[in-house]
């Protein structure tokens, strides 16, 4: 049976993550209160941030930026949006 959590992003009961997605306290907090559906939404948003801002993931500043954005996305006032980003048309 799937582990259920009250998702902080979707504000509903949903299937929880199978394991903490990140190390440390933030990973534990995400595992306890974020659903698979919301995490999939974050991965899409994270990809957009990496691509549109041309982040180099070998750069520790880029990784720290994404960690802060992860926390803002789920527990704050929302993550940054890329200026001028237009989502691709739905198929």
From Swiss-Prot:
Pfam families: Iron_traffic. Keywords: Iron. The keyword Iron applies. One of its GO terms (cellular component) is cytosol. Signal peptide: none annotated. InterPro entries: Fe_traffick_prot_YggX (IPR007457), Fe_traffick_prot_YggX_sf (IPR036766). It comes from Ralstonia pickettii (strain 12J). This is Probable Fe(2+)-trafficking protein. One of its GO terms (biological process) is cellular response to oxidative stress. One of its GO terms (molecular function) is iron ion binding. Transmembrane segments: none annotated. Belongs to the Fe(2+)-trafficking protein family. Could be a mediator in iron transactions between iron acquisition and iron-requiring processes, such as synthesis and/or repair of Fe-S clusters in biosynthetic enzymes.
